[in-house]
Amino acid sequence: MMSIDITTNHKIIFGDARKMDEIEDESVHLVVTSPPYPMIEMWDELFKMLNLEINKRWMEMENEEDEEKKEKLIMQIYNLMHQTLYPVWEEVYRVLVPGGIACINIGDATRKINGVFRLFPNHSKIIENFEKIGFVTLPYILWKKPSNKPNAFLGSGFLPPNAYVTLDVEYILIFRKGKPRKFKPKDPLRYASAYTKEERDRWFSQIWEIVGDKQTHPKIERRTASFPEEIPRRLIRMFSIIGDTVLDPFLGTGTTVKAAIELKRNSIGYEIDKSLKPIIEEKIGIKQKRIGMDFNVEFINRG
């Protein structure tokens, strides 16, 4: 990869990504994000806050005695959670350039509600919604998280038939806005962004084995659900060139912005939780002198 001197700009907005008024149409080249996972317990309260109808149906479900009606309410809640994310995906389509790529890290959910254990296939719901908006679905990546822990098999242990398969992969879904992006012949920034044969062979295989990131941070006593830096680093190298703009509408602790800075891409991040600001500042090294990196960071607080 050739060395290119470039000053990059990074904008971190504390606000709801369902309206990204700060971003112009067709001005983003790549989206890398991991949204809240519907029907994963740690995200229940956030979804209830973002969509009061979810809170209402949840209370109805807990008070309902008829099993058939409970079942319907559970599926209504699941669908409402995905409907809550849908405006973000519409905004992603609006801001992407023609040929721009969106990479969505999502896991399916397993959960026992009202005594019934079930799978909630989040990845298929995301694909359905992206295609409804107009995206082209590309082959996805399976992120397998290696673990030294013995598998926590669910169900009846060694006795068939009532045990359940353990979910040990997440999906990195890949979508494109329209036809492939076009470049000028011998574009210097594109050539400077090239990866090696070894990188290509490893990155473009469907299964990635990457150790998951810590889910807690010492400065806040709760889970942050951040993905490991290796994931946005690979995706940014694979699907953008130096000088491009990368968007993460669910920024969390700032992993995508950090990777964008180090890979000489511009970036924009949205985060609804303002308390994460000091963690983001620490992660991206805003108070540190970074050798060989020239970048500007702007924080915006919506009123």
Curated annotation (Swiss-Prot):
**Which SUPFAM superfamilies does the UniProt record give?**
S-adenosyl-L-methionine-dependent methyltransferases
Record key words, sorted? DNA-binding, Methyltransferase, Restriction system, S-adenosyl-L-methionine, Transferase
Q: What is its EC number?
A: 2.1.1.113
According to its UniProt record, this protein's enzyme class is: transferase
Which reaction equation describes what this protein catalyses? a 2'-deoxycytidine in DNA + S-adenosyl-L-methionine = an N(4)-methyl-2'-deoxycytidine in DNA + S-adenosyl-L-homocysteine + H(+)
A GO molecular function term, named singly, is:
N-methyltransferase activity
The biological processes this protein is annotated with in GO are: DNA restriction-modification system; methylation
The record's GO CC annotations read: cytoplasm
Q: Name the family the entry cites.
A: Belongs to the N(4)/N(6)-methyltransferase family. N(4) subfamily.
Kindly provide the name given to this protein in its UniProt entry. Answer: Type II methyltransferase M.MjaI
Give the species this sequence originates from. Methanocaldococcus jannaschii (strain ATCC 43067 / DSM 2661 / JAL-1 / JCM 10045 / NBRC 100440) (Methanococcus jannaschii)
**Gene symbol?**
mjaIM
